[in-house]
Amino acid sequence: DCCPIAGCPFGCTICC
Protein backbone atom coordinates (compact mmCIF):
# COMPACT_ATOMS: atom_id res chain seq x y z
CA ASP A 1 0.00 0.00 0.00
CA CYS A 2 1.20 3.53 -0.75
CA CYS A 3 0.27 6.41 1.50
CA PRO A 4 0.38 10.18 0.84
CA ILE A 5 3.31 12.10 2.37
CA ALA A 6 2.08 15.10 4.36
CA GLY A 7 3.88 18.28 3.33
CA CYS A 8 4.94 17.04 -0.11
CA PRO A 9 4.03 19.85 -2.57
CA PHE A 10 3.19 17.40 -5.38
CA GLY A 11 1.24 14.91 -3.26
CA CYS A 12 3.90 12.23 -3.55
CA THR A 13 3.41 8.85 -1.93
CA ILE A 14 5.61 6.43 -0.02
CA CYS A 15 5.07 2.70 0.13
CA CYS A 16 4.76 1.72 3.77
Swiss-Prot record:
Please, which domain of life does this record's source organism belong to?
A: Eukaryota
Q: Which UniProt keywords apply?
A: Disulfide bond, Secreted, Toxin
Write out the GO cellular component annotations: extracellular region
Q: In which tissues is it expressed?
A: Expressed by the venom duct.
Q: Where are the transmembrane segments?
A: none
**Using the chain's own numbering, where are the disulfide bonds?**
2-16, 3-12, 8-15
Coiled-coil residue windows: none
Compartments (UniProt record): Secreted
Q: Which GO terms describe its molecular function?
A: toxin activity
The domain-related comment in the record is: The cysteine framework is III (CC-C-C-CC).
Family classification: Belongs to the conotoxin M superfamily.
**Which protein are we looking at?**
Conotoxin ar3f
Organism expressing this protein natively = Conus araneosus
Q: What is the lineage of its organism?
A: Eukaryota, Metazoa, Spiralia, Lophotrochozoa, Mollusca
